[in-house]
């Protein structure tokens, strides 16, 4: 397979598809990549859409409860909190404090990396995916082009071509 190394760019002019430690989505905010949207809806339901079709949901929707948030925690757990700050859903991926990144991938999957510890399970076969690694400035022995520093660790994103 042919792999192209990409960097994560946090830019207001680009749609984001990643959350790092302590970043989150509030009501109406989303991660977007191509036709996929991972959104914290106003009703407190966290939903992954392909175009306008829901693919996965946290099933935490409560009518009229604007004020929820989904947070990628520094312990590796991704948690939806209600308006009162109570956890109403979690990925159950807690691994202890470290550097984690949640990625909405082009293969329709949402994955938490530090190690591959949680995903929505919506991976689509024969579609290129995204692999995130942090290895002291290298990705599988290759050089990292324009790495991004996340909590003092170098993080790179590698786009993997689809298998034929």
Swiss-Prot record:
Residues 16-125 form the Bulb-type lectin domain. Disulfide bonds join 44-68. Residues 1-15 form the signal peptide. PROSITE patterns: BULB_LECTIN. One of its GO terms (molecular function) is carbohydrate binding. One of its GO terms (biological process) is response to other organism. Not glycosylated. Keywords: Disulfide bond, Hemagglutinin, Lectin, Signal. The keyword Disulfide bond applies. SMART domains: B_lectin. CDD domains: B_lectin (cd00028). The keyword Coiled coil does not apply. It comes from the Eukaryota. Homotetramer. Mannose-specific lectin. Induces a Th1-type immune response in vitro. Causes a 4-fold increase in the proliferation of murine thymocytes and a significant increase in the production of nitric oxide at 24 hours in a macrophage cell line. Stimulates the production of the pro-inflammatory cytokines TNF and IL12 by rat peritoneal macrophages in a dose-dependent manner and of the cytokines IFNG and IL2 in murine thymocytes. Has hemagglutination activity towards rabbit erythrocytes. This is Lectin. The lineage of its organism: Eukaryota, Viridiplantae, Streptophyta, Embryophyta, Tracheophyta.
């Amino acid at each position: 397979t042919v792999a192209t190394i990409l960097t994560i760019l946090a830019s207001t002019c680009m749609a984001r598809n990643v959350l790092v430690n302590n970043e989150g989505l509030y009501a109406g905010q989303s991660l977007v990549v191509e036709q996929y949207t991972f959104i914290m809806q106003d009703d407190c339901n966290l939903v992954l859409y392909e175009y306008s079709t829901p693919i996965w949901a946290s099933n935490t929707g409560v009518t009229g409860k604007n004020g929820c948030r989904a947070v990628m925690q520094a312990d590796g757990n991704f948690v939806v909190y209600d308006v009162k700050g109570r956890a109403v859903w979690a990925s159950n991926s807690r691994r202890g404090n470290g550097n984690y990144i949640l990625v909405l991938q082009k293969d329709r999957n949402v994955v938490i990396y530090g190690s591959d510890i949680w995903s929505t399970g919506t991976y689509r076969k024969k579609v290129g995916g995204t692999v995130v690694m942090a290895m002291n400035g290298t990705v599988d022995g290759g050089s990292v082009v324009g790495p991004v520093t996340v909590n003092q660790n170098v993080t790179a994103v590698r786009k993997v071509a689809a298998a034929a």
